[in-house]
């Protein structure tokens, strides 16, 4: 997301996911499945807008983000007392997620890992130069769509645990830290994965004993990591 200059896409899809939650609550349906449906549709629309406004990509994110918030607010207002359920998705709670959601997270994590290992070179080309990827015979539009959809599904499944307000931070910061440490594309990926695991596990551990919100604790840990790496970055680059 960062290398493709689409960091705000995670924010956008998290807000759209909140709209999916509101739709589920309003219709009395499963919020998980409604969120996934809404996110997939949003991912398709986001790719269309990204291509339409190629030189102004922030326009597409602003349009969908505003729409997601507007739909979520209106439907939560119409849902009446059920709006309290929507509030829990704003900040999330790792202790309230269902076993079904945990299994879904493991499945999407496995899918992302397999896709990364199988298509790391095509993703490298797609990330840095779409024109070269197109000349190389890669299905650029399809790959971009799948990238958006997988990202959206991951965000939708993370929201019950991390909350829509902080899920984008949890997704972006490990990669941003990895970019400061890693020297190659692959090393950045592995550093981001390692930092993400350490930050998530330590955040859950600390939040349990300090009785603080897990998502906020994890976010602050990642920010602390980012600050430390930024301070010592000259030494890391020198090595």
What positions do the PLM features span?
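Structural signature of hydrophobic alpha-helical transmembrane segments
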Residues: 26-41, 106-110, 156-170, 216-217
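Transmembrane helix-bundle core of multi-pass membrane transporters
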Residues: 53, 57, 61-122
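Short loop segments and helix-boundary regions at transmembrane helix junctions
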Residues: 1-82, 178-190, 207-210, 233-235
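Cytosolic-side transmembrane-helix boundaries in multi-pass membrane proteins
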Residues: 212-239
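Transmembrane alpha-helical segments in multi-pass inner-membrane proteins
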Residues: 167-216
